[in-house]
């Protein structure tokens, strides 16, 4: 059975990834700050309380996993989303490397995608101002940290710019149109 660690499994994107992994019969260890938010009951699911800001605990939790998916987001309503993202994503990356993880897939943001030649979504003036701190922080982590990373096989997955309403109306609906 395929086994994966999923950081941020209780969030908007993380919960969709969790459901997809379980539907494909993966064994998932969901690593979340608030385990009570995971309502899924599945024999292939283990829920573990993890604070990603505690790099040593995260490293221990990731030992034995070849594959880790991080859908970590400190919360779109968090006034410190920019600072928390830039503080904690390097910790996730470092913990994964030290734990011997083979591949790290990070769910980033659409902000780094080009909407036309030379223009990234973040610079196109179409994203709501409220989203900008989170979008900017993910872009900075990607451009300033991940692009220089060579010690681990990583993927920075940028979802479509029309991913949804960031959970304001609940989880999105699986369409089966996009495949990763």
Feature locations, PLM:
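Short, polar loop motifs at secondary-structure junctions
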Residues: 31-37, 161
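N-terminal Rossmann NAD(P)H-binding glycine-rich loop of SDR-like oxidoreductase domains
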Residues: 4-24
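Conserved beta-loop-beta element that borders a ligand/cofactor-binding pocket
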Residues: 143-165
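Conserved beta-strand positions in the Rossmann-like core of class I SAM-dependent methyltransferases
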Residues: 5, 29, 48
